[in-house]
């Protein structure tokens, strides 16, 4: 069965039918579950995690390994240079290209931990203007020179409504608002009000969010980071450092990068850097779980400790036909 519906706009023309969405905090086992599900359903896997899209960071972002990639087709993993500020809109455009190219004709399983990706997929997203490199570079330079608080003051004068919705220290969103205003002459709020169409057919889609036991998750996080070190995480950090990238880029903020860089520079001991990275991972997982708990709607099935995983899998496969 085709993954694209062609029965008319009212029925969701051009949207992916029978999509399966799997969300969960980092280290919750969602990638393994998605792989099993994709094999059973004869489907493909689409990365829905903002960090796993970056190249170089194979190990530190826990991307699927070669053996898993060989089992079913995987898309949107490691395809973005770490020097790029990859956005939700860019990810959605990449998904649209997969659809246009017929790559999602088999049942797609979207899996990841980036809640905004799932929201954009199911609800649509505002189309933002393209930002010319000269404008992007200008505002990155201004951020370095002036700092977030001063740029927030500038935004307050130029676009007070947008500025009032942002914390003065939220450098990434402040710069984004200034870039959009500079490139288009319109407030980012105006662009955000123009929401696009969803890319999936919600009526046939199936939604699953993993809610793991907290203690078990902490244990998995601890063990997984140790395994990352054994698999070459330090070499990835060296490769990333060799690129000489802006430290404010999203890829440079991947968990473990700054701590391990500090240890390699002699600013921290390696045990201290490792412990900091593990703590940051636990905190990130907690934020993800909180977001999923409060932001995902009733259509999302919750997979909790003690639930029958096999029954859940069978239901998802049976319903997605």
Curated annotation (Swiss-Prot):
Is Zinc-finger among this UniProt entry's keywords? Answer: no
Task: Identify the residues that bind substrate.
Answer: 26-31
State its Enzyme Commission number(s).
Answer: 2.5.1.75
What does it catalyze? adenosine(37) in tRNA + dimethylallyl diphosphate = N(6)-dimethylallyladenosine(37) in tRNA + diphosphate
For this UniProt entry, the molecular function terms from Gene Ontology, in alphabetical order, are: ATP binding; tRNA dimethylallyltransferase activity
Query: Which stretches does the entry tag as region Interaction with substrate tRNA?
Result: 49-52, 172-176
Q: Which cofactors, if any, are listed as required?
A: Mg(2+)
Q: Per its UniProt record, what Pfam families does this chain match?
A: IPPT (PF01715)
Looking up InterPro entries in the UniProt record yields:
Dimethylallyltransferase, IPT, P-loop_NTPase
- Which GO terms of type biological process are on file? tRNA modification
Site positions for Interaction with substrate tRNA: 114, 136
Keywords tagged on the record: ATP-binding, Magnesium, Nucleotide-binding, Transferase, tRNA processing
Q: How would you summarize the oligomeric state and partners of this protein?
A: Monomer.
Q: What is the recorded function of this protein according to its Swiss-Prot or TrEMBL entry?
A: Catalyzes the transfer of a dimethylallyl group onto the adenine at position 37 in tRNAs that read codons beginning with uridine, leading to the formation of N6-(dimethylallyl)adenosine (i(6)A).
Q: Which family does it belong to?
A: Belongs to the IPP transferase family.
What is the designated name of this protein? tRNA dimethylallyltransferase
